[in-house]
Amino acid sequence: MAMGKYSRVDGKKSSSYGLTITIVLLLSLCLVGTWMFMSSWSAPADSAGYSSTDTAKDVSKNDLRKEEGDRDPKNFSDEKNEENEAATENNQVKTDSENSAEGNQVNESSGEKTEAGEERKESDDNNGDGDGEKEKNVKEVGSESDETTQKEKTQLEESTEENKSEDGNGNEEKAEENASETEESTEKSSKEVFPAGDQAEITKESSTGDGAWSTQLVESQNEKKAQQSSISKDQSSYGWKTCNVTAGPDYIPCLDNWQAIKKLHTTMHYEHRERHCPEESPHCLVSLPDGYKRSIKWPKSREKIWYNNVPHTKLAEIKGHQNWVKMSGEHLTFPGGGTQFKNGALHYIDFIQQSHPAIAWGNRTRVILDVGCGVASFGGYLFERDVLALSFAPKDEHEAQVQFALERGIPAMLNVMGTKRLPFPGSVFDLIHCARCRVPWHIEGGKLLLELNRALRPGGFFVWSATPVYRKNEEDSGIWKAMSELTKAMCWKLVTIKKDKLNEVGAAIYQKPTSNKCYNKRPQNEPPLCKDSDDQNAAWNVPLEACMHKVTEDSSKRGAVWPNMWPERVETAPEWLDSQEGVYGKPAPEDFTADQEKWKTIVSKAYLNDMGIDWSNVRNVMDMRAVYGGFAAALKDLKLWVMNVVPVDAPDTLPIIYERGLFGIYHDWCESFNTYPRTYDLLHADHLFSTLRKRCNLVSVMAEIDRILRPQGTFIIRDDMETLGEVEKMVKSMKWKVKMTQSKDNEGLLSIEKSWWRPEETETIKSAIA
């Protein structure tokens, strides 16, 4: 019965045998054809014997790579060709051995298989003999595809070399001397740039099935082909143009919005010097002054700068007799004087110290605010006493005074004491200085002096060096009387009044109280105390109020205890952090320490040695997302200064930065920064752009970075790979140089040098036409 049964089955099979064979062959051909198509795109690396780790390395080094022209062509190309030849031979041996096997035998491969490859193999096994030849043909196609990929890579290297030789002013060639050295150090520095894992982990990628998703290899090949169409295509896609504005090369979008300024009802409180950002941030690039040169290095820049970089002579004509600034051939020179210190800033600095030794420059007093700074010689020479002075003044009050300061390499920013709070937290400055700063402190209930009181640390000093202190004419005497009444009502203690006989000036030194006793004993509540709901740290676009915040007396809260002496304070976590949770989720002291150690490692072992940066050319630095200020702290021993920026939508860690003896500012990166073009030598952005892309136009952000970064300046960005890819396209479209790349998992780093290139086509910004 059994035999008969099987006979009936065999009979049925015979009757439909031809149809079955046809269907099987068609399915086999479809599967083989599909596999051939996929392997021509996604299989070369695996076919050639690469592991998935090798594939990931190829992707990371090409998607986020250093400029190819900086590599050693022989080492790169020859090594790849040798690997491909060896892999092709290996494939041929494997194919021959597979052809001798039985049709139902499961073939084993030394390389990893994709799911698509395994699916094809199972189908081939079921088809029996004869499919080995098909498999051989498929592998030969894969080898040809791999050779094609290698040719594409060589063409891309040649194309990149051609693009790198283009430069608007011819100055780009200087930076290429260090490029090859930078590439050699890329692999070496990976552990320091990403200290949490070793080198193998940086490029580790598991081999997974492609499914419906595009692989990294396909994406990288497509990107290579797109880049081969030349940088000019990217330029047209981003449409860069040079800004046509009244301010020309000095354009500051939020301070040169003439449409908004003309609509102001009054300028009594310097409203025209405050921020009025255009509705849409500009996408254009600011022009360079004729004859602009790379800035003179510090400390020579403190004494002289190139005239063509800041071509303004009005201040030299007005203040030349006070030793502010003088013309000297192709330079502007700064003798180190000022309105209050004609005989030099250092003498004046020592005069203040001698007037009240408790100030203790560079020890107790580390971070100060200089109001109405002139050309900032006071702040420039305080570096000799290990003091950081952040100077500010309004735009054009004296022609380009802040621009002079920044070109000299002295910390300064544009701001005005008008209708809004200064962009600093409360109780952060150790000392505030005003030398003939022309601010009417005593009017309108002392509103402006009360703003200084907000920013001044309890126990901090206010040094007022102005004519009412040492002159007795009717006007000055009236101001002195009003100031005396106001400061007494504010409970400020007049510590001393001293006269400098050499400069024939004087200074009054006041101290802010460290408790609320005096406030509670005042016969009248004038100036009034602020409401308990008023946050003294709220400073972004907050209107000024004529009130005083109570002093914190709880020792577990910030402001109750003076920070450690400098330099101990820079590495010591503030005691008041104990009750808070850190930015990264750990207890704040642990967060603080971990952040500090991380940046110490990255800066000392990677940034300083392996990034190809000439740090002797770096003076003005900005950390665009500072968190705890660890990056700035790691650079404290270098002859530079760092502007730490805490974005307005980030955790408010700026008070911690000040507590460390560093300084910074709040800012919204969807808007323009309050500084002149070409301010900074180096910009650092750690995971900033991936947060900005949610609410800002990244093209506008890059235009702003181009505006404030000097030609040949460095931009270091750390972020996720998607964001870095977008930024890399933008900077290349502006002809910037990607000097170094690094990646680990989905995180990466780019070190980029700004070019001198400016677009020929212009764009008129209507809001910036006076």
Curated annotation (Swiss-Prot):
Residues 39-770 are lumenal. Signal peptide: none annotated. The keyword Nucleus does not apply. It is a single-pass type II membrane protein. GO terms for cellular component: endoplasmic reticulum; endosome; Golgi apparatus; Golgi medial cisterna; Golgi membrane; plasmodesma; trans-Golgi network. Its EC number is 2.1.1.-. It comes from the Eukaryota. One of its GO terms (biological process) is methylation. Residues 92-109, 205-220, 227-238 have a biased composition (Polar residues). Residues 44-238 are annotated as: Disordered. Glycans are attached at N75, N107, N163, N178, N244, N363. Keywords: Glycoprotein, Golgi apparatus, Membrane, Methyltransferase, Signal-anchor, Transferase, Transmembrane, Transmembrane helix. It is found in: Golgi apparatus membrane. InterPro entries: Put_SAM_MeTrfase, SAM-dependent_MTases_sf. The keyword Transmembrane helix applies. One of its GO terms (molecular function) is methyltransferase activity. Residues 55-79, 110-124, 131-177 have a biased composition (Basic and acidic residues). Coiled coil: none annotated. Residues 1-17 are cytoplasmic. The chain crosses the membrane at residues 18-38. Belongs to the methyltransferase superfamily. This is Probable methyltransferase PMT25. It comes from Arabidopsis thaliana.
